[in-house]
Amino acid sequence: MNRKVSKFLKDYRVILLIVLVAASITAISTMGIQQGLDLQGGSLIQIQLERPVDAATMNTVTSVLDKRLNIFGVKDVKVRASGDQNVIVEIAGVQPDQVADIVGKPGKFEAKIGNETVLTGTDIVSVQPPIITGNEWEVPFRLSTDGARKFAEAARGKAGEPVKMYLDDRLITAPEISAEVATGKPVTDVRITGAENSKAEAEVQAKEIETLLKSGSLPVKVKIVGVSSVSPELGKQFAEGAVIAGLLAVLAIAVILIVRYRSPILVLPIFFTTLAELLLILGAAAVIRWNIDLAAIAGILAAIGTGVDDQIIITDEVLSGEGRRTRRKFRIKDAFFIIFASAGTLIAAMLPLAYIGFSRGATGIGLLAGFAFTTVLGVIIGVFITRPVYARFIETFNVAGRK
């Protein structure tokens, strides 16, 4: 027996599995598993651009939105493109009404003297923190040298005329040109001022303007077409439900295997192989920072169920044959022919679902992208890593006579 154990542990497939399981445990413990919004709570905002855009423009849009939300003070933000006309914003632990105004505005700044645009957002080089005094607020910012020069030329000789400052075509303030500025002397330090009904409203308005000025304008107009949220309490309930579902699935599998084989040497290896498969899936998810949500959990359960099916196929093929070594090898080859055919069919069925899911984003059928991805990942891990190890165990320890 000791010689068989030594031979089994020296097999390259077994060594590979042990190394990958150890790496997965390390990845899970150090990197953690990212939970989807339906498990940890948070908000999901779907934004639609006014027209389809190319990859470079889409990168600009997602970059500006990500910058805005970080400046606004929102943590755990994920902004990603969904096709060529939609953007998905995922925010953990934040209600959507707190950030919807920020992500849904173009952020276009203009300053006009008369009907002439004298400043735009591109002329701003830095924005200072807002100053709140009672219900009044001001947001100081600094102009570039070229912007200050353009403004000075436009303001020359126009003392007392208003400088109308617009944000997304909405008039924010209209300070008068001072006598000093009207001389044509460039001024780099400018400020936007205003007043609200309360100090709290003043703080919100000033923070929003600071955020929009700092992040810059979006290259295209956008609109919010979908908003959803899950409270942390509800997310906790979902997570608990998923754990219960997983435990019930394990219990059901255990009952079926015990009833079918009535032998620990047949049942325990299937459980250890299944556990290894689960660790590899979660480890891969931790490394690539893949969100584990309810759909992904369903995919994991489907992959594990498929894995148990495959191990039953291998076991039954060996048990139905004669005890000779050559016969066992042929039986295992027959089993793997069935397993590969089944895996190919399943992957072929999942790929269109994954494609549609990724192209649609995290709404509607897009939620099933997580299901398809984790199912395919689990099947690939099983077929190329865990199934061969289980087959090697069956072959090495000659389970044909142990039923």
From Swiss-Prot:
InterPro entries associated with the record: SecD/SecF_arch_bac (IPR022813), SecD/SecF_CS (IPR022646), SecD_arc (IPR024912), SecD_SecF_C (IPR048634), SecDF_P1_head (IPR054384)
Segments crossing the lipid bilayer: 14-34, 238-258, 265-285, 294-314, 336-356, 365-385
Main location: membrane
Location within or outside the cell: Cell membrane
Gene Ontology biological process terms from the UniProt entry: intracellular protein transmembrane transport; protein targeting
Keywords carried by this UniProt record: Cell membrane, Membrane, Protein transport, Translocation, Transmembrane, Transmembrane helix, Transport
GO cellular component, one term: plasma membrane
Membrane topology term: Multi-pass membrane protein
UniProt-listed Gene3D superfamilies: 3.30.70.3400, Multidrug efflux transporter AcrB transmembrane domain (1.20.1640.10)
Keyword rRNA processing attributed: no
UniProt cross-references to SUPFAM superfamilies, sorted A to Z: Multidrug efflux transporter AcrB transmembrane domain
Disulphide bridges, residue numbers: none
Entry keyword annotation includes tRNA-binding: no
Complexes and interactors: Part of the protein translocation apparatus. Forms a complex with SecF.
PANTHER family: PROTEIN TRANSLOCASE SUBUNIT SECD, PROTEIN-EXPORT MEMBRANE PROTEIN SEC
The family this protein is said to belong to: Belongs to the SecD/SecF family. SecD subfamily.
Matches recorded under NCBIfam families: PRK08343.1-4 (NF006218)
Role of this protein: Involved in protein export.
The protein's name: Protein-export membrane protein SecD
Organism: Methanothermobacter thermautotrophicus (strain ATCC 29096 / DSM 1053 / JCM 10044 / NBRC 100330 / Delta H) (Methanobacterium thermoautotrophicum)
Classification lineage: Archaea, Methanobacteriati, Methanobacteriota, Methanomada group, Methanobacteria
The encoding gene: secD
